[in-house]
């Protein structure tokens, strides 16, 4: 989703979530706004080998062309989506000012076919591996207390752990006071991220929130 792997998980995690959704009758919805057609042509669901019930996509379905996004899923759920009202039928209203815009649809179709033709996901993934390995080497060489990791072409360079807290304490879990207690620490970490982002930019390295590189 929008955090694009900020909290890294193993392949078995999503399979466990899938099993829980099946057990309790809940829909499994994947936010693939960032990961769709990026970590793999089949997105994060292909990368993790898990089939969600519904999937949300962002601008990629329009090849970066404006006014594009998408929702896909299993037929049994997608057939409940409707752009209008149908008497006597259960429907979930889905619509938008530019929904089903033909130019955006064509742009997306063409872009995805080109991604497939050029094997772009795999090539970008190898570049992500190379960049991450280089960052790890630099961190080790200079003894920096940072962490670098990646999922394909999505690379993370974490210098503050902005949202990393110890949730092992039951007292912390039972009350929102835990987060309030640590709010000053959160602000300090956020400020550090912003400063790192500015330093990266000054040296020609564009990041998102001072930690992510696509």
Give the label of every model feature segment:
Residues 1-214:
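Conserved N-terminal phosphate-binding loop of PLP-dependent enzymes in the Aspartate aminotransferase
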């Amino acid at each position: 989703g929008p955090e694009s792997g900020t909290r890294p998980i193993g392949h078995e995690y999503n399979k466990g979530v899938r099993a829980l959704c099946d057990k309790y009758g809940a829909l499994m919805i994947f936010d693939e706004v960032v990961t769709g057609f990026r970590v793999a042509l089949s997105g994060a669901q292909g990368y993790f080998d898990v089939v969600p019930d519904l999937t949300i996509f962002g601008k990629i379905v329009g090849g970066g062309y404006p006014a594009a996004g998408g929702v896909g899923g299993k037929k049994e759920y997608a057939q409940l989506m409707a752009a209008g009202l149908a008497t006597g039928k259960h429907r979930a209203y889905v619509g938008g000012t530019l929904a089903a815009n033909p130019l955006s649809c064509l742009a997306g179709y063409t872009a995805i076919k080109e991604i497939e033709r050029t094997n772009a996901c795999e090539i970008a993934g190898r570049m992500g591996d190379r960049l991450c390995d280089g960052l790890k080497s630099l961190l080790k060489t200079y003894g920096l207390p940072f962490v670098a990791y990646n999922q394909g072409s999505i690379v993370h360079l974490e210098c503050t752990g902005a949202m990393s807290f110890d949730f092992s304490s039951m007292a912390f879990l039972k009350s929102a006071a835990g987060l309030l207690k640590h709010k000053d620490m959160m602000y300090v970490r956020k400020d550090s991220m912003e400063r790192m982002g500015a330093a990266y930019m000054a040296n020609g390295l564009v990041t998102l929130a001072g930690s992510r590189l696509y």
